[in-house]
Amino acid sequence: MSVTMRQMLEAGCHFGHQTRFWSPKMAPFIFGHRNKIHIINLEKTLPMFQDALKFTKQVAANRGTILFVGTKRQSREIIAEEAARAGMPYIDSRWLGGTLTNFKTVKGSLKRLKDMEVAKEAGDWEKLSRKEALTNDRDLDKLQKALGGIKDLNGIPDAIFVVDVGYHKIAITEANKLGIPVIAVVDTNHSPEGVDYIIPGNDDSSKAVILYAHGIANAILEGKANSVQEILTAVKEGEEEFVEEGKVE
C-alpha cells in the first residue's frame, strides 16, 4: 500500500497547470513555479495520499463500497481496470446527474440493463424482427456504456474516488449532499472544496493517474484481505470455544 516520493516524482505528480490557470485555494500545496507551470509540493502530497489510502483500506475492511470516477480520455481506461481489479464499481463514461441523489431511478435502469443482457444471452432476441433486434442492440450498448461499471451497485457507495474534481463537480456535489466521503486528486487549477481526502497532484498525466488508481485499488485489496482474515480468526476462535465447552471432565 506504500507509495514513495520517488515514485511520485517519476510519475510526474508534481507538475501542476499553467500559473494563470490556478485556484488560490490550492496555494498551501504549491511549492513554486517553473516555466510558468505550478509545481506541487509532494512533501505535502505524500502524507495526504497515505491518509487517503488508510481511509480506503478501512472502508474496504468494513466491507464497504468505493465508487471509482474518471471519465476523462486519459484516465478512463485506467479507472475501469483498477476498479475491476479491486472488485469495485466505476464510472468511466459521462456522469449521469442523479446517479447518487436519485439512485432509485438509476436502480431501475440497472435492472433493465441486466434484464436485457439475460434476454440476449437466452436467445430471446432471435425471435424478434431484424429491426427490433437492432433497436435492442443499440439500447443495450447505450446502457452498458453509461451504466456497465455500476451494474452490480446495490445502493449508494460508502465513498467515492475521483480523478479531476473540475471534470466531476456534479459527482462531488451529489456525494456531499448525501454525506458520502470524497477521495480526490486535485490539480492546481481547481478548488479542493467538498473533498474529504485531498490528493494534491497532476490529474492529466496517465502515469500519475495509474499511480493514484493503483494505490487506491491496492489499499482496497489489502482491506478486503484483512476483513477475510478477521472472519477466519473469529470462526477459528468460536470453534475452539465450542470444543472447550464440549469437553467432559
Curated annotation (Swiss-Prot):
GO terms for biological process: translation. GO terms for molecular function: structural constituent of ribosome. Belongs to the universal ribosomal protein uS2 family. It comes from the Bacteria. This is Small ribosomal subunit protein uS2. Keywords: Ribonucleoprotein, Ribosomal protein. InterPro entries: Ribosomal_uS2, Ribosomal_uS2_bac/mit/plastid, Ribosomal_uS2_flav_dom_sf. CDD domains: RPS2 (cd01425). GO terms for cellular component: cytosolic small ribosomal subunit. It comes from Polynucleobacter necessarius subsp. necessarius (strain STIR1).
